Every structure is written in C-alpha cells, then in structure tokens.
C-alpha cells in the first residue's frame, strides 16, 4: 500500500544516521551507540542492543547491500519481500525490547511521555513531536507505555500495511 511505502520511507530516513542517502551497517551501529550513550545504558545492555541492531542488518539487509549501502528504493523493494517471510515478525521485534530498555531511563518497566520524548531525541527528531505519537500507541490510555505496547506498535509499523495508530511509531511520516 502507499501508506506502507510511506512508513518505510520514514524508517529509512530515521536510520540513515549520516544522511548520505544510503543505509549501511554503520548506520545501525551508530543508532545503537547513540541510544546506549544518551540513555546511559549499562555496558551489557549496550552490547545486546548493538548485537541486536547489527543482527537486523545482518539477517535482513546485508545480502541486499552486496557490500555497499542500500538506497531508499532498494530498501523498500527488499522490505516488501522480507515482510512476507514467516520469520519477519520475530526479526523485526528482536531489537524492540532493547529500544524499550534504552528509552525506559528510570528502569520502572514503563515509558513515560518524557521518556518517549528522549526516544525521539535519540532518533534526531524534535521531542515536541513525541506526545502525538505517544498518545497514538498508548492503547490502554494510562499515560504510560508498557513493553508490550511498545513492541506491538513497533512491530505493527513494519508488518501492517493498513492504516493504524502505530504508523507514527518512528515519528511523523515523511
């Protein structure tokens, strides 16, 4: 769907950390490093996050890249095929609990509105955009995101090609 393509363009934009128009393993490494540093993540958690994010590259994208970066059009066509894989949901969900841990800076097993603003800041987005996304994925409207809500929203972003509140998980669509 056009919406799914727009979501993939949004994600591509968020993970192209060096903004060179291509995603590489280095972008995933940079994302993990920034999240670990800005959330003051414990070293053992930082290693798991790094392994998980580079694992997304290794499992999903390295064969597409062929030793170089992946441009947006190639990324989108590859993801169209990848999400059809029966293991896609598990691979997509893999790093999400680690992102959750990175964003849950006070380690209370919930993400507050303020902590979600930190998530947006880590992605290079204006934290002022976070409340609208937060409210959209706070499915039980308790003002907090559980790990289940966070992982479900993040996974749905990639897997679901229909309109849903989770389309704003990675921020406003580009």
UniProtKB/Swiss-Prot annotation:
Domain EF-hand: 3-38, 55-90, 91-126, 125-160
Superkingdom of origin organism: Eukaryota
Pfam families: EF-hand_5
Annotated positions of the N-acetylserine modification: 1
Binding positions for Ca(2+) 2 per the UniProt entry: 104, 106, 108, 110, 115
Swiss-Prot/TrEMBL keywords: Acetylation, Calcium, Metal-binding, Muscle protein, Repeat
Residues involved in Ca(2+) 3 binding: 138, 140, 142, 149
Disulfide bridges in this chain: none
Coiled coil: none
Listed GO MF terms: calcium ion binding
Residues given in the record as Ca(2+) 1 binding sites: 16, 18, 20, 27
Function per UniProt: Like parvalbumins, SCPs seem to be more abundant in fast contracting muscles, but no functional relationship can be established from this distribution.
Other known facts: The sarcoplasmic calcium-binding proteins are abundant in the muscle of arthropods, mollusks, annelids, and protochordates.
This protein's name: Sarcoplasmic calcium-binding protein
